[in-house]
From Swiss-Prot:
Residues 497-517 have a biased composition (Low complexity). SMART domains: Tubulin, Tubulin_C. HAMAP family: FtsZ. It is found in: Mitochondrion matrix. Its main location: mitochondrion. Pfam families: FtsZ_C, Tubulin. CDD domains: FtsZ_type1. Keywords: GTP-binding, Mitochondrion, Nucleotide-binding. Probably involved in mitochondrion division process. When overexpressed, induces mitochondrial tubule formation. Binds to and hydrolyzes GTP. This is Mitochondrial division protein fszA. Disulfide bonds: none annotated. GO terms for biological process: cell division; mitochondrion organization; organelle fission. The gene is fszA.
Length: 517
């Protein structure tokens, strides 16, 4: 009876202490074998065979996410925070904290310079690794784009991986409104972090806005912290939390060790068909960045609920298996969560996506370029269609000019009209026999067309062509200068001027300076 009461007290106390080490400490001093266990080694594996999992938050974003996890009582996790800003560490909820770069930054922060954050982390890396301790799995969380998190996350990850710790990076990319410079720093930091971790999960903050576009700025950052919380919880629960189906740490290590970039999706469903709803939401989650996961090589699946049925678990696993490579390594676990109250939550971690992500990004760039080219072509066709109605006006003007050319030119005193010149030249050259033959052919309407003589073509003389061309050029120049001059005045200036002194002709014999003198 006494042993039963002791175990009942242990179960109640386990709800207060969230880490396995604290639970083992209680068991060591409350069981009947306490006298013997106090003299044994400090190896806790004899009591609870659960892996030690640690979350390290670095920088302002990482410290905020750790505070959110502690406030939500994430089960079975140790927390460590590190920052160059002493004021941010003072309000942290974590018991383990490290001030980075005490001599370099003096607790004043990195000033959004990743190089300063990197050097500050290298200065305090030994103290930080002592706080992390002998853990089997380390989550490095940070908000990329600043100074401390962007520069120091890769330093912590490389030091942990060198000790044989399974290192997973879960970081965020900034919103668009935070600026292009911050986004550029984040992308550079992601390149360095990817080289230092076993698996990297990147959460783009901009994708979260697609779920709800009417968010206040404070709620938006809270939603980012909740996504980080759910991603770590989806992995840690199947290792340390009791449930229907628990996984070994070796299974998780086989999926996430040296797996490169990974993607995450979370979905919840309730009511009829809740299993299919939760699975489809997780598979079509915006955090998957619209990337086809059919070529994924590893899948980690966590199914949580308060009243799960075996048939629902089987249906969810079959739906996820149909979307990935048939040869993919799929491991799944099922845990109890009384807070869901009739809901099912599916957490999906897809690994081995490096090549698929690169191919998808190249295709997206290519489609973006093609769409830009199509838009330019569409805009040019619209401009052409707007300019096409001008062409009939041009043709009308040309037809009017041709009609004016066909009409007889006005007779101006002092010069010969081209028609008179042409008629005199043609009649002078035709003999009387040719005139008689021409009249016969014109009167004979039944004569074949081959025997009919063609009318002589009327061609302007070169002198008149030059004059008309000069008139046209002067007219265009004067229209541009907006100085209208009458047509007759221009003709008089051209035809009635003296070639020597450019004076007008004087036809009056009695006046001095006339051309008849």
């Amino acid at each position: 009876m006494s042993q039963f009461m002791i175990r009942y007290q242990i179960i109640n106390l386990s709800k207060v202490f969230n880490s396995p080490k604290s639970l083992n400490f209680i068991k060591r001093y409350t069981t009947s074998t306490a006298s013997t266990t106090t003299t044994t080694t400090n190896d806790d594996s004899n009591w609870i065979s659960t892996p030690n999992i640690t979350v390290c938050g670095i920088g302002g974003g990482g410290c905020n996410s750790v505070n959110n996890m502690i406030n939500k009582e994430l089960y079975g996790i140790d927390f460590v925070v590190a920052n160059t800003d002493a004021q941010a560490l003072a309000i942290s909820c974590s018991r383990k904290m490290v001030q980075l770069g005490k001599t370099l930054t003096r607790g004043l922060g990195a000033g959004a310079v990743p190089e300063v954050g990197k050097k500050a982390t290298e200065e305090s890396i030994e103290e930080l690794m002592n706080q992390i301790g002998d853990t089997q799995m380390l989550f490095v969380t940070a908000g990329m784009g600043g100074g401390t998190g962007t520069g120091g996350a890769a330093v912590i990850a490389s030091a942990a991986k060198a000790k044989g710790i399974l290192t997973v990076g879960i970081v965020t990319k900034p919103f668009h409104f935070e600026g292009k410079h911050r986004m550029k720093l984040a992308e550079q930091g992601l390149i360095e972090l990817e080289k230092s971790v076993d698996s990297l999960i990147v959460i783009p903050n901009e994708k979260l806005m697609e779920q709800s576009q009417e968010l206040y700025i404070g709620n938006a950052f809270q939603m980012v912290d909740d996504v980080l919380y759910n991603s770590i919880r989806g992995i840690s629960d199947i290792l340390v939390k009791p449930g229907l189906i628990n996984l070994d740490f070796a299974d998780v290590r086989s999926i996430m060790c040296n797996s490169g970039k990974a993607l995450m999706g979370v979905g919840e469903g309730e009511g009829k068909g809740r299993d299919a709803i939760a699975a489809n939401i997780a598979l079509n989650n915006p955090l998957l960045e619209n990337i086809n996961i059919s070529g994924a090589k590893g899948v980690l699946l966590n199914i949580a609920g308060s009243d799960l049925k075996l048939q629902e678990v089987d249906h969810i696993v079959s739906l996820v298996s149909s979307k990935v490579d048939p040869s993919a390594n799929i491991i799944f676990g099922s845990t109890f969560d009384q807070q869901l109250e009739g809901k099912i939550r599916v957490t999906l971690i897809v690994t081995g996506m490096d090549q698929l992500i690169q191919q998808q990004q190249q295709q997206q760039k290519q489609t973006k370029i093609e769409s830009q080219v199509e838009q330019k072509l569409h805009s040019t066709t619209i401009v052409d269609q707007e300019l096409k109605p001008i062409e009939p006006q041009k043709s009308i003007i040309i037809e009017e000019e041709q009609e004016e050319q066909q009409q007889p030119k006005p007779i101006i005193p002092g010069i010969f009209v081209e028609q008179e010149l042409l008629t005199t030249t043609t009649t002078a050259n035709i003999t009387p026999s040719q005139q008689k033959q021409e009249s016969l052919t014109q009167n004979n309407i039944f004569s074949p067309p081959q025997q009919q003589q063609q009318q002589p073509s009327i061609n302007l003389q070169p002198n008149y062509q030059q004059l008309y061309q000069q008139l046209y050029q002067q007219q265009q120049q004067q229209l541009q200068q907006q100085q209208p001059i009458s047509f007759l005045k221009r003709l008089s200036n051209l035809f009635f001027t003296n070639g020597n002194n450019n004076k007008p002709y004087n036809n009056n014999k009695n006046t001095p300076g006339s051309n008849y003198e």
